[in-house]
Design a protein with these regions (language model features):
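Divalent metal-cofactor coordination and adjacent catalytic microenvironments
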Residues: 1-217
Length: 217
């Protein structure tokens, strides 16, 4: 079930990490702003990669994020669906729901805020969404980033900082001192063990499991 998706009010800051947290990931003392420009850019990349790994839908204009945003979806209904699978999860506010041009009240729907599932109801009965456009406006994402999500983002930031400081193709290095100084480096040939084709390594991806969206046809 596809929808037309629009970000109405984007997050003021889509980054999952504060500059203080990024400084800590880089091993800087509190208040050391010497690398803030570099770390701010790193934080943006890390947050974007996590959003990609979690399959967070964007509107083609704003950067997808797990931070809180006001969004709008329009579903073209065929009269056979009882559930709307919203593009964003962790919903904090359901602002507006209309079906075929008629506004619904709170008692007309049942929302699973964490899963992003919206059901049409009447009392204790589940109804099918009628033919026509179903419009949903809501706020989803986090104002305050959960600790486990911060931890995963910090791990990815540290990994990126570590990778930037060394050559990932170097398998091993040995130094001989006797006469002058001989440095020998062995390089990996082919794929580097532990590497990943995606933006987020498997161990960090496992920590993000509850934030990953499931694709719905």
């Amino acid at each position: 079930m596809r929808s037309t998706f629009t970000v109405v009010t984007p997050a003021a800051d889509p980054s999952l990490l504060t500059i203080e947290q990024l400084r800590a990931a880089a091993g800087l003392v509190p208040g050391d702003a010497s690398r803030d420009a570099e770390l701010t850019e790193l934080g943006a990349r890390v947050s974007a990669d996590i959003a990609t790994a979690c399959q967070i839908r964007g509107d083609g204009v704003h950067v997808p994020t797990l931070r809180s945003e006001e969004v709008r979806e329009v579903f073209r209904q065929r009269g056979c669906d009882d559930l709307l699978f919203l593009a964003r999860r962790f919903i904090s506010d359901l602002t507006l729901v209309t079906e075929a041009g008629t506004a619904l009240v709170a008692d007309d729907t049942d929302l699973d805020a964490e899963a992003g599932l919206l059901q049409r109801i009447s009392g204790t009965r589940t109804l099918t969404w009628p033919r026509g456009d179903a419009v949903v406006e809501y706020t989803a994402g986090f104002e305050t980033v959960p600790p486990d999500l911060v931890g995963a983002a910090m791990d990815l930031a540290r990994l990126r900082l570590s990778a930037a400081a060394r050559d990932p193709l170097v398998k091993g290095e040995s130094v001989e001192i006797p006469d002058v100084r001989t440095v020998r480096q062995d390089y990996w040939v082919g794929a580097v063990p532990g590497s990943t084709a995606g933006p987020v390594p498997a161990d960090i991806l496992a920590k993000l499991s509850q934030y990953i969206n499931v694709a719905v046809a």
